[in-house]
């Protein structure tokens, strides 16, 4: 079977020219040249979303126009009058199939236009790449896939009568008083076609290339042309075997050093016996070799251990245990400078304030018969008078006198109803005392007898009421509360760390007055001891070493 010979290209493909004679007898030659041919396009379809997903022909077609003037008898000597010629030009583009199709016997079904976008372009006079007129089509799209050509039709609107065609009728002058239809005419000059290009479907579209140099030159001169600086080509053919395996291996190799080269800061530590102590210390961060541990929280009757264990500093000067009264055992540490010990004691103060929801710890003020604990109570969230965890016995009371003072306490204190304190957890802990737990004997910290009320024994030694005591200018009023804890020598008082204006004010106090100035108090406050003489007086020692007394609260 004989093959069909290839179709010969049309005569007006890529470049075409035509000439005409004007009324003045001049020859005008029009020359069109498709400088940038369309190469590919993606079919946009005819659905509802076709206009939104429309892809223009790539690269955008560019057609150059040149106009020459010459003598009718001499075609050799031509003058380029493209910029000097006074006329309007526009180019209209249509879509044609590259292969002509035979007409069927039946009537063809009506179809909608296949070419969409902006098929009309006006002339733009540019200096580059050469001085000429250019028609640019940056927004042309094709709906269906196939092989097509673009056909460009040039139309001219003459402005001067001398440039009209030789056979054109002479226009009659318009009357000024009678309006008439505008008599402007468009003349078809010539047609040029592009080379065939392919329109692909969405699945077969190879992608877009970078913008050509001609598109960049035109865009630099102010024309509307889309510029792409990267290649958007789709990879065709079989997939390489290492396309995805390489990425997986690379990511796998990248994860291995991250996991094994750098040690994990939160890895499981070396197995060691756990301690139930509130402040268990890691052996790697201990302050001395084989520092003895303090008794655990269960031995002191605490219900919850501390959430974050911290290092426990050693006591500055632990008192040696006597035969009559045992004292708590403090951790043994090597001798260090006093400044370093004071720094550790100050840093350890913050470790004594966990969350204030620790019930079950009886207060010595409400339950005088509870078992003594060397730890401070955890009901105060921020107590400035808290010292180190192991506090020595009060120096004002001999240890041998404490057992005998238990019998001097005649009656229990009445329940407390009104407390002037800023911590709400103190009210709950003191209003509802919990019976003390049975303490388990321990070799590390033997229990001590409770500190009972000394109102009967020291009533003669303290005749003045609390209001007549010489107050310290830096003393902080705490309301009707009792603090049985002693101060360590390295503990800074609260007044050294906080200013005078930060003290809470009670009972009509003012920031510029003393804690309990006797001159500014009412007569009822001055004679409180006389009016309330039948109540018990409680004596306690403050953090700065001063002895003070308190009257039991009213029922």
Curated annotation (Swiss-Prot):
GO cellular component, one term: nucleus
Motif position, Nuclear localization signal: 39-44
Disordered: annotated segments: 1-23, 39-60, 234-533
Summary of the knockout phenotype: Reduces nearly twofold the length and width of the conidiophore stalk and vesicle.
Entry-linked PROSITE patterns: VELVET (PS51821)
Biased segments, Polar residues type: 336-372, 380-389
Keywords from the UniProt entry: Cytoplasm, Nucleus, Transcription, Transcription regulation
Ranges of biased composition (kind: Pro residues): 311-331
Residue intervals of the Velvet domain: 25-228
Biased composition (Basic and acidic residues): 13-23, 239-258, 492-503, 519-533
Pfam families reported for this sequence: Velvet
Region called PEST, residue ranges: 439-479
Subcellular location: Nucleus; Cytoplasm
Keyword Lipid biosynthesis belongs to the record: no
Role of this protein: Component of the velvet transcription factor complex that controls sexual/asexual developmental ratio in response to light, promoting sexual development in the darkness while stimulating asexual sporulation under illumination. The velvet complex hat acts as a global regulator for secondary metabolite gene expression. Increases spore dispersing capacity by impacting conidiophore architecture.
Subunit organization: Component of the heterotrimeric velvet complex composed of laeA, veA and velB; VeA acting as a bridging protein between laeA and velB.
Domain remark in the UniProt entry: The C-terminal PEST domain is a region rich in proline, glutamic acid, serine and threonine residues that is required for the light-dependent regulation of development and secondary metabolism.
Similarity remark: Belongs to the velvet family. VeA subfamily.
Protein's name in the database: Developmental and secondary metabolism regulator veA
Gene that encodes the chain: veA
């Amino acid at each position: 079977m004989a093959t069909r010979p290839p179709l010969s290209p049309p005569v007006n493909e890529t470049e075409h020219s035509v000439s005409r004679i004007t009324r003045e007898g001049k020859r005008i030659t029009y020359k069109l040249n498709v400088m940038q041919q369309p190469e590919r396009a993606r079919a946009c379809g005819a659905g509802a979303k076709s206009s939104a997903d429309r892809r223009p022909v790539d690269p955008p077609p560019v057609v150059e126009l040149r106009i020459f003037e010459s003598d009718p008898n001499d075609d050799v000597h031509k003058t380029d009058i493209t910029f000097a010629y006074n006329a309007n030009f526009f180019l209209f583009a249509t879509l044609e199939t590259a292969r002509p199709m035979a007409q069927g016997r039946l009537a063809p079904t009506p179809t909608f236009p296949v070419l969409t976008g902006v098929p009309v372009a006006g002339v733009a006079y540019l200096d580059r790449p050469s001085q000429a007129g250019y028609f640019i089509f940056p927004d042309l799209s094709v709906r269906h896939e196939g092989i097509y050509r673009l056909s460009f039709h040039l139309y001219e609107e003459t402005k001067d009568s001398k440039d009209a065609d030789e056979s054109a009728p002479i226009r009659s002058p318009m009357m000024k008083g009678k309006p008439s239809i505008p008599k402007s005419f468009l003349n078809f000059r010539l047609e040029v076609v592009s080379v065939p290009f392919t329109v692909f479907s969405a699945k077969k579209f190879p992608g877009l290339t970078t913008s050509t140099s001609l598109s960049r030159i035109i865009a630099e001169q102010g024309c509307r042309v889309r510029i792409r600086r990267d290649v958007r080509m789709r990879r065709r053919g079989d997939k390489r075997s290492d396309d995805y395996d390489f990425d997986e291996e690379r990511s796998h190799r990248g994860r291995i050093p991250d996991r094994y080269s750098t040690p994990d800061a939160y890895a499981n530590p070396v197995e060691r016996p756990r301690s139930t102590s509130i402040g268990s210390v890691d052996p790697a961060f201990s302050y001395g070799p084989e520092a003895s541990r303090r008794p655990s929280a269960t031995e002191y009757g605490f219900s919850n251990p501390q959430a974050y264990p911290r290092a426990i500093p050693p006591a500055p000067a632990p008192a040696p245990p006597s035969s009559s009264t045992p004292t708590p055992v403090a951790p043994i540490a090597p001798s260090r400078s006093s400044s370093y010990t004071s720094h550790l004691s100050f840093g350890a103060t913050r470790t004594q304030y966990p969350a204030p929801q620790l019930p079950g710890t009886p207060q010595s003020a409400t339950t005088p018969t509870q078992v003594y604990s060397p730890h401070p109570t955890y009901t105060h969230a921020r107590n400035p008078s808290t010292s180190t965890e192991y506090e020595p016995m009060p120096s004002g009371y001999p240890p041998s006198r404490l057992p005998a003072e238990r019998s001097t306490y005649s009656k229990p204190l009445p329940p407390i109803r009104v407390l002037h304190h800023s911590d709400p957890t103190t009210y709950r802990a003191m209003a509802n005392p919990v019976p003390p737990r049975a303490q388990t004997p321990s070799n590390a910290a033997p229990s001590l007898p409770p500190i009972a009320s000394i109102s009967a024994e020291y009533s003669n030694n303290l005749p003045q009421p609390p209001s007549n005591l010489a107050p310290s200018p830096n003393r902080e009023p705490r309301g009707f509360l009792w603090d049985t804890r002693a101060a360590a020598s390295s503990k800074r008082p609260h007044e050294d760390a906080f200013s005078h204006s930060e003290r809470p004010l009670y009972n009509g106090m003012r920031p510029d007055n003393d804690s309990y100035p006797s001159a500014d108090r009412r007569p009822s406050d001055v004679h409180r001891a006389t009016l309330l003489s039948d109540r018990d007086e409680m004596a306690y020692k403050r953090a700065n070493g001063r002895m003070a007394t308190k009257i039991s609260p009213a029922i």
